[in-house]
Design a protein with these regions (language model features):
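Acyltransferase
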Residues: 71, 76-131
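Pocket-forming structural segment of enzyme catalytic cores
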Residues: 1-74
Length: 131
């Protein structure tokens, strides 16, 4: 779990304007998009200590979100069933990381699912209806 901090660009963005300045999210990946600074068509919307480009927009056509805003009560354990995933998590965070991660995810699930609803509603109302 990690904190994602929104930048001022959030205020002008049709998908994320309604979000609080900071949200807690689930991130479990080995790769990330980096080094977009030179691309003038990319707008950074949110960042974290771990991943600079947590949320970014390309022009008005596409978004990149490098964390999971959507979870259910079995998400972490479902992923932990994959031996390579569990091993990678424990290599990075230590023995028992899966259980701790699962508890943190469950503790934050209601807020994360509320953020998912906001994102879906904004996408449905503002993106789909505009196009």
């Amino acid at each position: 779990m990690l904190d994602v901090n929104f930048l001022d660009e959030k205020k002008k963005d049709i998908l994320f304007a309604d979000f609080p300045q900071k949200i807690t999210s689930l991130q479990w990946h080995s790769y990330e998009v980096q080094e977009l600074e030179k691309n003038k068509d990319v707008t950074l919307i949110a960042s974290s200590k771990e991943t600079k480009y947590q949320i970014f927009r390309y022009k008005d056509n596409a978004y990149g979100i490098q964390f999971h805003i959507e979870i259910k009560d079995t998400t972490v354990n479902d992923w932990g069933c994959v031996p390579e995933y569990k091993s990678a998590l424990e290599n990075q965070l230590g023995q028992g990381a899966l259980e701790k991660f699962d508890k943190e995810a469950r503790d934050n699930m209601n807020n994360m699912n509320n953020y998912s609803k906001i994102l879906y509603t904004n996408f449905k109302n503002d993106i789909i209806l505009i196009k």
